[in-house]
Amino acid sequence: MAEDRVLRVRKLLDAVRASGRTALTAPEGKVVADAYAIAVPGEELATDVDEAVAYAARFGGPVVMKIVSPDILHKTDAGGVIVGVEGAADVRTAFHKIIENARAYDATARIEGVQVQELLPQGQEVIVGAVTDPTFGKVVAFGLGGVLVEVLKDVTFRLAPVDPDEALSMLDSIRAAEILRGVRGAPAVDRWAIAEQIRRVSELVSDFPEIAEVDLNPVIATPEGAVAADIRVILAESVPKPRRTYGRDEILTSMRRLMQPSSVAVIGASNEQGKIGNSVMRNLIDGGFSGEIHPVNPKADDILGRKAYKSVTDVPGEVDVAVFAIPAKFVASALEEVGRKGIANAVLIPSGFAETGEHELQDEIVAIGERYGVRLLGPNIYGYYSTWQDLCATFCTPYDVKGGVALTSQSGGIGMAILGFARTTKTGVSAIVGLGNKSDLDEDDLLTWFGEDPNTKCIAMHLEDLKDGRAFVEAARATVPKKPVVVLKAGRTAAGAKAAGSHTGALAGDDAVYEDILKQAGVIRAPGLNEMLEYARALPVLPTPQGDNIVIITGAGGSGVLLSDAVTDNGLSLMEIPPDLDASFRTFIPPFGAAGNPVDITGGEPPSTYEATIRLGLEDPRIHSLVLGYWHTIVTPPMVFAELTARVVAEFRERGIEKPVVASLAGDVEVEEACQYLFEHGVVAYPYTTEKPVAVLGAKYRWARAAGLL
């Protein structure tokens, strides 16, 4: 049966292409709908007015009449749709009016006739569709439908194909989800019928790569079902050439040699200070890299005390990585030598490739890399750091603080911001990697590696685009259950689908699709650079929450209000404090304080009050996370608060009780030192802000849910 439907649709699409068209007519759309069991109303194509009258009489009751022309895509704009036509006289009038309007709209349009369609009962209008996204490929969409769809833009997206549960989840992912369940006396619609329409559309576009867009708008949803009043199918002008892909084992093998090399060659190494080749050599040597370092320069015998080689092919033994520090015009010939030498990875620092319009030059090096099996990092990058190997293969400032955060950036400027942030906050990193033009190696390769790397506890990535969104999603889904993945997607205000031929295409702006697909993959999306860096720094510090109950303990009522707002803004839940727990908190706070949630201990309390309430919050198993609001007083100075909090948290950790604890410190400049101390002792703390600590806690909760741990 499945093969039969594919053959039927294949025959139709081939005929459409043979006629030089990319848009299917309504009758052709019905053939596709019938093949994939997409529910549509009864309809017929009338080639003259008498046929229209006969078809309308057969359907009984009012009908909808629509122009059928391969040259008129938006029928309503052409005056080619009349709804609620009833009776032979009105059918005749409507038929002639539609033809007349179509001629006025486009005098050269080919008119095949008028579609006579059963008028569907009133119901909730929704849209079901699919587009071919340049990053993620086939993507299915769902949202509120009708003429306001492009105004409201209440739409959600998933990778196609979707299974029934994924399709059903889309109904709860729009802002107006409750409308489908019935509001103000309106009945609930048949949600499973809508989900089936979504699933079948996703199967259709997955079976036929040449289908660029499918639009069911509107779909009329009622308690009895969901029927597409209109179906539009648009074919792509051409199908893009598939890019070369690598298997997981291939990726891990090459990435292991890149991130844990035993031997590195520097092509373009130099004795002259100020040269990139000199900076790379100095960083490798001064950083303490224990592997072999081979300078390559045809004009030198010795570079920084190391024997220099005329060509990389002269280097003895096996080489894992070749770092290029030569002008772009010389890269291709040197890469040929790297390929003949059998080197696994080429780190291409030079600029002057696709980013400057030299696409052919970049295509040339990619072809060389593929021919020899050399993976390319870059070009147009600052290099990379692999701290656990004491490897600093870059011409920028060195960094050697080891830790659990892996950071990548597509931009060199962002890479240096990462470096400065890490140094300022004393953040330990496992790696910092520049991706630049991403001619070959990209985020999914790095995700695959960092997901398996025992030294990496959190991955944060700045990206401007993804070469292969599906490969990224696959890598993210494999990684997220093990460790958080944070993404900062730049360019979120991009215009999107400018030349879309359907409602769905117009709705599928770049960022709208990225937002839903990244969420589907379990990725934590950071709204800005600072948030990405703070999430990366803080998430490995926080233990995984074991439940949703959050309690705020604060010394300042104003902070408590702001912290409560932040909890709600981040999709978290303040615990309803039961009477016995309320009574326990009240034993430690003054009569003019406030229990409940937040627990307001007031600002003039001594350290013992902070300690007692924090202990109670950690001790009670019904509380899952603590948010602390500190107010600087002479009674309890910042470092006193920091030390007692760190001590109590450490004590409970030793007892096997670990809960996320974040803190907001308001006060004079001493709170900055206190926050750094708390961070270093397992409590995520920030000065002068109530939003940031709760945002980090919210990110931890989002990861825990995506990883299936909560």
Regions found by a protein language model. Give the residues of each.
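Catalytic-core regions of core metabolic enzymes
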Residues: 1-710
